[in-house]
């Protein structure tokens, strides 16, 4: 039972969380030792490679997903919590009410973020929230910077949020308008968070949509690009072609952005010039989405594809973009 895994940023290790009986435990795995044994054909038990870090205290909440700080000092962990009756009343009063044709996939829940010291196992509070907190990400470049979302399974009044690990900063990131359907934010570079404003419904195409980025230091917002919306007029009802971008990412030098579309295509965009390149088609977007991302040096795009299995299983695919200008 591997549980949730997160590769360390500084060393060849992997942090692993595991639910064992009633405990949520964190371990760190020595990958150098593990792969050396794999090479020799003598892999041992998990205990031969893992070191126990700590157990999450039950009084701190029910832990969920987590991200690891860029210095590998802390894990930032989302939790569900009980809270007070006053908090629950505020939560329900402020909860997002979707359009009539949108299901409520994830109900609001009192949540928060805790941090675990990855040397000592100590757990302390970062912030409490009054909405379902998910998609937590830590900056790969600046210690103590955290991006997360109000997870509804669909639209939200305000999806993206930012906080610092000491809890002194806790604020909305990109203040939304009623026609903004924000999704799939990614803490891609030192100063920018990239995200999508969806255009997959006619009502959403009455303003700009596509891949967008926000500057964490200035709150300035830039539209990077959109594709394929013109195909919507040719689509049969129920098809996902012509709905624009769904997920996005960016290279660490901010030169390139990449996105997959509802129709299963992957596009590359030059952030400086706006030039668009159609990299891949027909990833099927099932059994999961393409979710493209970049190699650390920005020369390759990695994505998932169900193309070769007719959507039954996923293959990991990679495209070399080093020749693109």
Predicted regions and their residues:
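Asp-box/WD-like beta-propeller blade repeats and closely related beta-sheet repeat scaffolds
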Residues: 17-112, 121, 125-128
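Blade-level signature of beta-propeller repeat domains, shared across WD40, Kelch, NHL, RCC1
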Residues: 289-325
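Beta-strand C-termini and the immediately following turn/loop, strongest in propeller blades
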Residues: 15-21, 29-31, 76-82, 104-107, ...
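Conserved beta-propeller blade repeats
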Residues: 1-17, 53-75, 130-149, 177-196, ...
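Structural motif
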Residues: 22-30, 85-90, 108-114, 155-161, ...
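Multi-bladed beta-propeller domains
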Residues: 1, 31-61, 116-132, 163-181, ...
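Loop-centered beta-sheet repeat module
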Residues: 125-170
């Amino acid at each position: 039972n591997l549980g949730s895994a997160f590769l360390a940023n500084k060393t060849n290790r992997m942090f692993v969380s595991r639910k064992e009986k009633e405990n949520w435990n964190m371990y760190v795995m020595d990958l150098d030792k593990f792969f050396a044994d794999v090479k020799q054909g003598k892999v041992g038990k998990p205990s031969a490679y893992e070191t126990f870090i700590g157990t999450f205290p039950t009084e701190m909440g029910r832990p969920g997903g987590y991200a690891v700080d860029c210095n590998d000092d802390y894990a930032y962990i989302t939790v569900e919590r009980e809270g007070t009756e006053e908090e629950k009343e505020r939560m329900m009063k402020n909860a997002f009410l979707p359009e009539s044709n949108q299901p409520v996939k994830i109900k609001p829940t009192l949540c928060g973020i805790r941090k675990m010291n990855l040397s000592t196992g100590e757990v302390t509070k970062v912030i409490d929230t009054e909405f379902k907190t998910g998609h937590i990400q830590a900056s790969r470049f600046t210690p103590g910077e955290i991006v997360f979302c109000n997870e509804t399974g669909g639209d939200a009044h305000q999806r993206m949020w930012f906080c610092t690990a000491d809890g002194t900063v806790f604020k909305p990131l990109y203040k939304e308008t009623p026609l903004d359907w924000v999704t799939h934010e990614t803490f891609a570079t030192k100063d920018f968070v990239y995200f999508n404003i969806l255009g997959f419904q006619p009502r959403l195409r009455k303003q700009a949509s596509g891949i967008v980025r926000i500057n964490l230091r200035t709150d300035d917002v830039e539209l990077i690009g959109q594709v394929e919306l013109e195909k919507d007029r040719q689509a049969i009802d129920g098809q996902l072609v012509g709905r624009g971008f769904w997920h996005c990412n960016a290279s660490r030098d901010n030169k390139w952005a990449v996105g997959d579309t509802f129709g299963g295509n992957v596009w590359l965009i030059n952030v400086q010039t706006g030039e668009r390149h159609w990299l891949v088609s027909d990833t099927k977007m099932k059994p999961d989405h393409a979710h493209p991302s970049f190699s650390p040096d920005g020369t390759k795009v990695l994505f998932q594809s169900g193309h070769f299995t007719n959507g039954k299983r996923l293959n990991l695919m990679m495209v070399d973009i080093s020749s693109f200008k």
